[in-house]
Amino acid sequence: MTTSLFTQIRRDLHQIPEPGFAEVKTQQYLLDYLKKLPQERIEIKTWRTGILVKLAGTKPKRLIAWRTDMDGLPIVEETSYPFRSLHEGYMHACGHDMHMAIALGLLTHFTEHSIADDLLFLFQPAEEGPGGAWPMMESEEFAEWRPDCIFALHIAPEYPVGQIATKPGILFANTSELYIDLVGKGGHAAFPHKANDMVVAGSHLVTQLQSIISRNIDPLDSAVVTIGKLESGTKQNIIAEKSRLEGTIRTFSMESMALVKSRIESLVKGVEIGFDCQATIDYGVGYCQVYNEEQLTTDFMQWVQEQCDDVTLITCKEAMTGEDFGYFLKEIPGFLFWLGVQTPYGLHHSKIEPNEDAIEVAIRLVSRYFTWLSQQE
């Protein structure tokens, strides 16, 4: 096994980013690679555009799972790569290409080196939306190979290569999409008194929504309401009949999520009355928090500090990031950690270029951890 192989795999995958539950080329690429591995100890199942691979251990006491995401993002790539995306308007801007290369590296390692416990590798589609974790967990394929513990990583542009970060307990927030549609009465710009202007109504609602965090959420708690898109109107001299707001809600507690949604609904009702319009609210896709099981995470962090001279561990703070891996952790003990890839551009940026040296770091670290974990009672 050579690390350059998995760098090339990452580059191949980088060229074929696909939307959630449409990762057809990605799935086929992964299956083609899996077929080249020694088949004696592995079983392969497909689920929609995802893949489950079970690898038999020598004396299994448990089933240890590793999960990677697969999908790309609707972003026009602006990197300097010679291996830029071949799918116009889509890009691997969140590191899922690296995540998959690392997963294949781990799987390959354990086809060449024995391990006591059984391993399960989950190639999960649709992390960016509409969410693949929960339906995968509900599948018959997953039920037959339900793991005893589960782990994952995510690239982190802000950390240097060779550095990882995590913490016990809450790591990522609860998230919910937010879509609000307002419908009033359009008309000629010269006669505003004969129309109900949804540009004004939508703008008013945006400012009202910003009061939720400052005036309704405990200052010692954390929450975010962001409106990322406001769309209204057709021409400069036409009063807009419709307005659409698109945004996101993020909280660390489910209580705060419920409170934020309640306040949104109250404010929207106020806009309906105040601007004589009709409104609908859609919360779209929502993910539960990523909660790292305390004991497993603490033991992992201690193991890294004591056994891994080539990796630096940082105890990080919670982040408002959303990740549907949280659904796995809601029912199965495990954790997620950040993997340093040192790049000036952040996640979901069109110019992000993660340092590929991190692939080798991750494969080496996790393979050693799994070997150690499988030796524990």
From Swiss-Prot:
GO terms for molecular function: N-acetyldiaminopimelate deacetylase activity. It catalyses: N-acetyl-(2S,6S)-2,6-diaminopimelate + H2O = (2S,6S)-2,6-diaminopimelate + acetate. GO terms for biological process: diaminopimelate biosynthetic process; lysine biosynthetic process via diaminopimelate. Keywords: Amino-acid biosynthesis, Diaminopimelate biosynthesis, Hydrolase, Lysine biosynthesis. The active site is at 69, 128 (proton acceptor). Pfam families: M20_dimer, Peptidase_M20. Catalyzes the conversion of N-acetyl-diaminopimelate to diaminopimelate and acetate. Its EC number is 3.5.1.47. InterPro entries: AcetylDAP_deacetylase, Amidohydrolase, Bact_exopeptidase_dim_dom, Peptidase_M20, Peptidase_M20_dimer. This is N-acetyldiaminopimelate deacetylase. Pathway: Amino-acid biosynthesis; L-lysine biosynthesis via DAP pathway; LL-2,6-diaminopimelate from (S)-tetrahydrodipicolinate (acetylase route): step 3/3. Belongs to the peptidase M20A family. N-acetyldiaminopimelate deacetylase subfamily. It is an enzyme of class 3 (hydrolase).
